[in-house]
Design a protein with these regions (language model features):
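Extracellular/lumenal mature domains of secreted and surface-exposed proteins
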Residues: 3, 15, 20, 24-123
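Bacterial Sec-dependent N-terminal signal peptides
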Residues: 2-9
Length: 123
């Protein structure tokens, strides 16, 4: 009889653990959106491009940028989502951002853009 009572308690405890695990929401997937903020002409045929990114869920994150999407990150980890890079004018580029949260979640995004025409220099 005592063995049967222990079996009931173990069964009830197991059921409670399973239900609490099912009720705990999973962490929200990390997403990132990369975009061009602005382009400013420099010295004739070059453009300073400001890139940035937003993440969901919002909160502290670390960012790395690959300015030409060639597989090599050009920046160190930074808490700032915004960077600037100089590109030749009138060319198409794809930049890639990698975002990492403190909990280890990682997300990537790319932004493709054509740099503005800057003949003769100035804004």
């Amino acid at each position: 009889m005592k063995r049967n009572q222990w079996s009931k308690w173990i069964g009830v405890a197991s059921l409670g653990l399973m239900l609490s695990a099912l009720a705990t929401p999973a962490a929200q997937a990390l997403t990132v959106n990369a975009f061009v903020v602005k382009q400013v002409c420099l010295n004739g045929d070059f453009v300073r491009v400001t890139l940035s990114a937003t993440v969901q869920p919002a909160g502290p994150a670390k960012y790395r940028w690959d300015f030409t999407n060639n597989g090599t990150f050009d920046t160190a980890l930074s808490s700032s989502p915004t960077v600037t890079h100089t590109y030749p004018d009138e060319r198409r580029f794809t930049a890639r951002v990698r975002v990492m949260k403190a909990n280890g979640q990682v997300a990537f995004d790319t932004v493709t853009f054509t740099t503005r025409r800057c003949s003769g220099g100035g804004g």
